[in-house]
């Protein structure tokens, strides 16, 4: 490892630990893992863990495993397994040949559970789940021993084998570790190792009738895979003594160590998998990849580039204490990434027709437009200009306030890449609604500059009516209105304006020809991405993130 990579690796306390372990000789190589449970789609919080675990392996020349913690078949589906693999790859990481499943180790875990029984460190408990919960005690009161705690090992082994064989119904018995019912850490009060669950497993089918708990499977899976640094979020800090107890009391092949970091919390966002599942099942969103969802699939469908997520995770860093990050930090990272790469296009979301009265009827011309102002390699495109165009409704005001510089009666403005125009007449319907504008243009200003040097204070985008392409545009906002939504009452805090669907938008023809997977900037509007709902003759765009609205700031300041 070079000095430069060493410096890069020392950005956070976990990388400092890894660097120290290598320097001291505790480990000769580094192995990390990302171990999702396949009971839902990955979200922003997972992105932080993915970047950390794969990033550590990359920084230190090690490897990172992708392991599915598939120990609860009642909630796990192949759909989630497939989606997780897609999302990790999309984020930019590759596990190579190191794809594993906790179910790969079911036989070994069963054998180790038998070992604990023979050692007098595990027993079969016939109490109900509620009886076990009530006997566990509280933070201030010790728990009570189960009446089955002192069962002979032979009887426990027999019952455990019969549990595996499927002789008993769900919930009839569990296997518990025999540790200390008076332990200050409640996780050490004889935790459950196995429960009976008659359910079809996505990989093992109906072979098993018992399944290991997360706590029992996790550390031992780490050991089997020779994980050196088992990195997880802070809610597992109280589980570390149990993680260590299993490793200390089993003949495991290696000794991993668990380290915890702060989980990701973001304003206007809930990352609870329970909440996300209820949002989908309750019909509050249109699926796991709804662009309002904080899932990686949702962010991808919204048009967020993977590099923006990686940069966001890098900026928030790795801390030991939980905190909440403003969602604006994510938006900033998205804008930065898209500003570098997105081609510029013109799109009118709320069209207002403009007739240029002194432009020759039946005539049109091609103008040259720049695809990216800071990236000459993207080249230029040709756009057509004619007598009738569309502009944004909000770019015209009949009686403008002092600091409004866009089009109004008698005012001259610049049309992007085209000409100066001046509004001469406002055409309205009987209700007083503006139907169209009658304007004139200055032929000498072709390209957007006046030969006499006169200046205008506004440049507006437009689309030629003759070749404009209709489109639907979906404007997405925060899914939750409140900055710190309450997971317990999330439904009451949903934002009823989290999506606005605009039909009848008009966009330039290049947008129909662009690659479907390419992000674009609608000039003066924001960054957009073609949605998978698009079809021949039907363009649909999702707003990824908006641009800064300077007029909104001025209006707010003056109100």
Swiss-Prot record:
Family matches, as PANTHER family: GLUTAMATE--TRNA LIGASE, GLUTAMINE-TRNA LIGASE
Enzyme Commission code: 6.1.1.18
The protein's assembly and partners: Monomer.
Location in or out of the cell: Cytoplasm
Nuclease in keyword set: no
Protein name: Glutamine--tRNA ligase
GO CC terms, sorted: cytosol
